[in-house]
Amino acid sequence: MRGPEPGPQPTMEGDVLDTLEALGYKGPLLEEQALTKAAEGGLSSPEFSELCIWLGSQIKSLCNLEESITSAGRDDLESFQLEISGFLKEMACPYSVLISGDIKDRLKKKEDCLKLLLFLSTELQASQILQNKKHKNSQLDKNSEVYQEVQAMFDTLGIPKSTTSDIPHMLNQVESKVKDILSKVQKNHVGKPLLKMDLNSEQAEQLERINDALSCEYECRRRMLMKRLDVTVQSFGWSDRAKVKTDDIARIYQPKRYALSPKTTITMAHLLAAREDLSKIIRTSSGTSREKTACAINKVLMGRVPDRGGRPNEIEPPPPEMPPWQKRQEGGGGRGGWGGGGGGGGRGGGGGGGGRGGWGGGGGGWGGGGGGGGGWGGGGGGGRGGFQGRGDYGGRGGYGGRGGYGGRGYGDPYGGGGGGGGGGGGGGGYRRY
């Protein structure tokens, strides 16, 4: 099975003709036979030379080139070839056969002449495309931000609205209007700029980053203040008198509230437009400033409010965690006699109680009361232990601890002490076994 037969291969003449038609060429070389014949004749063909001159002039009008191809060199072929060679070198022609070798032998072949036409026509096509893109970028949409800014300048300066959206042309009108206005005012009317240096691209980018960081910080602060404003105004409507006027408050407050924006409006343009008078510091409490900042709310006086205290010099110190230390006093409790009472207690505590009938109980120690009496059938109750108080025949009392009641023992009927509890000792008794 045979596939489709391949079509005719594209030729260089066909590429040149297609490019010339796209460029809008209206000369005599739009036919393939005429183009081939002119390429074979080279620079000696007037049609070929005219086409080269037309392509070179179109390229020069779109590009900033020093070299050019003019009609003045057609009479002298060597000069004409020098112009073409210099033009191709400035255009960075990739065909070495057109820019190197003996200049008299460069355009003698048909293929070399077609390469020259193809290079010039394609370069012209590329230049037209780039120029068209630049023109489209300058013809901005009338709804774009840049166009709105330029139109705002037109309104401020009193320039009639432009029918075109060509930004460079509109900026030229603004510049001429500003120069005309400045020529009619005093020399120092505008003042010297605060920023006296010219910024390069790197410095401008750095200032943009600084402005972005500050804008984020101020946006956070503005949002906080706006939220506080909302909460404050909302709290005014809590009273019964204000609840009936909710609609009136909203009608007055909402338009002013929506006019506040959390986004900052300071840009690089404000920095460039700042003048030296902006750096002057003026006190906000000066007389001239207060004339413009005074309002009726400054005359509203607050009533008397209760004193909430909280001053450091009025705060009382906390109470001590332990009692103050005092020196021990001399003197302690004595021992009781036969049937006698107990001795007096030491400093800070109660005295020990006397035992009944037997050899008496001992006195208490530091703050502690000793107890316990011996004798026939007499059982003394234990005393309360004070601060490290010690009974006579008993155990040691703890810190504020309480001595236990002694148990009855079995022993000597003449006052033998039984096993006591924590505080006072137990009394022995005359008991029957």
Curated annotation (Swiss-Prot):
Pfam families listed in its UniProt record: DUF2465
One MF annotation (Gene Ontology) recorded for this entry: protein methyltransferase activity
InterPro entries: FAM98
Record-stated family: Belongs to the FAM98 family.
Classification of source organism: Eukaryota, Metazoa, Chordata, Craniata, Vertebrata
Keywords: Cytoplasm, Nucleus
Role of this protein: Positively stimulates PRMT1-induced protein arginine dimethylated arginine methylation.
Summary of subunit composition and partner proteins: Homodimer. Component of the tRNA-splicing ligase complex. Interacts with FAM98A.
Expression by tissue: Expressed strongly in colorectal cancer tissues compared to wild-type colon samples (at protein level). Expressed strongly in colorectal cancer tissues compared to wild-type colon samples.
Subcellular location(s) of the protein: Nucleus; Cytoplasm
Domain of life: Eukaryota
Keyword Magnesium attributed: no
Protein name (record): Protein FAM98B
One CC-aspect GO term: cytoplasm
Stretches with biased composition (Gly residues): 331-433
Disordered: annotated segments: 303-433
Gene: FAM98B
